[in-house]
């Protein structure tokens, strides 16, 4: 039976709408983790498909400056993995949450304990950007009997045979990385990006979402046209931190009709 994240995103895809997943940094709020539910419900009320929730880490190798600084602010507020898990247990939401964490915080907490402690929460997906596919067995056995999907990341340099290997048996969605580099860098897309995304669609039987560098209305239109939806991080994080209006951008993303 498919996991909840797979079912919910496939249901959105079936309507012809683009899937929209904003990223937020847990604890990057004037109230620290006490403000997490407020942010989640703000985004839920705007109709987002799912929410990616980042765990702060001191050495975020895949993150650009906006998200790295958000992580430092969160750590300064006292955010810990344990405290986040306890906070997530108290949050009620109808949309799936996807945790983005580097492997170190997960390892320190204990993978088995982490998964068990999230069992009764809204967390339905897990992204670990620094965990090689060859080491997925460090995590996958603990997810097998849960409703949490391990999300595969596929880069632009991934050949088709490797794509098949990464995607085989995956649930939730495929995270297609739009740029070679860190999050937040926009506009420097490779000429063969659309071809790469089309190829991903041929081998994936779950939604393909494009992320890294997606930040403008033009990006929304481009990537919704060649994938099933988008993930937006740095733009959302920056707007929430600086108190900038972001509602119209999110509404446009949520309403996108293919």
UniProtKB/Swiss-Prot annotation:
General function of this protein: The alpha subunit is responsible for the aldol cleavage of indoleglycerol phosphate to indole and glyceraldehyde 3-phosphate.
Taxonomic lineage: Bacteria, Bacillati, Bacillota, Bacilli, Lactobacillales
Family (UniProt): Belongs to the TrpA family.
EC assignment: 4.2.1.20
Complex formation: Tetramer of two alpha and two beta chains.
Active-site feature positions: 52, 63
Coiled-coil stretches: none
Gene3D superfamilies, sorted: Aldolase class I (3.20.20.70)
UniProt-recorded Gene Ontology molecular function terms: tryptophan synthase activity
Record organism: Streptococcus pneumoniae serotype 19F (strain G54)
Catalysed conversion reaction: (1S,2R)-1-C-(indol-3-yl)glycerol 3-phosphate + L-serine = D-glyceraldehyde 3-phosphate + L-tryptophan + H2O
Pathway field: Amino-acid biosynthesis; L-tryptophan biosynthesis; L-tryptophan from chorismate: step 5/5
Taxonomic superkingdom: Bacteria
Name used for this protein in its record: Tryptophan synthase alpha chain
């Amino acid at each position: 039976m498919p996991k909840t994240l797979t079912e919910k995103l496939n249901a959105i895809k079936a309507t012809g709408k683009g899937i929209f997943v904003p990223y937020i940094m847990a604890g990057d709020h004037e109230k620290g983790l006490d403000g997490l539910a407020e942010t989640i419900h703000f985004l839920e009320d705007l109709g987002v498909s799912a929410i990616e929730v980042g765990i702060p880490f001191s050495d975020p190798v895949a993150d650009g400056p906006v998200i790295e600084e958000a992580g430092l602010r969160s750590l300064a507020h006292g955010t810990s993995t344990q405290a986040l898990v306890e906070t997530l247990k108290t949050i009620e939401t109808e949309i799936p949450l996807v945790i983005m964490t580097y492997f170190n915080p997960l390892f320190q907490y204990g993978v088995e304990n982490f998964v068990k402690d999230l069992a009764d929460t809204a967390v339905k997906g897990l992204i670990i950007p620094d965990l090689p596919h060859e080491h997925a067995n460090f995590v996958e056995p603990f997810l097998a009997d849960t409703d949490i999907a391990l999300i595969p990341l596929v880069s632009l340099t991934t050949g088709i045979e490797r794509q098949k290997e990464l995607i085989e048996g995956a649930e939730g969605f495929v995270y297609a990385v739009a740029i070679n580099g860190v999050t937040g860098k926009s506009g420097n897309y490779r000429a063969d990006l659309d071809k790469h995304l089309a190829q991903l669609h041929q081998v994936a039987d779950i939604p393909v979402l494009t992320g890294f560098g997606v930040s403008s209305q033009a990006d929304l239109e481009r990537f919704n046209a060649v994938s099933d939806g988008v993930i937006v991080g740095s733009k959302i994080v920056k707007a929430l931190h600086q108190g900038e209006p972001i509602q119209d951008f999110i509404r446009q993303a949520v309403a996108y009709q293919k």
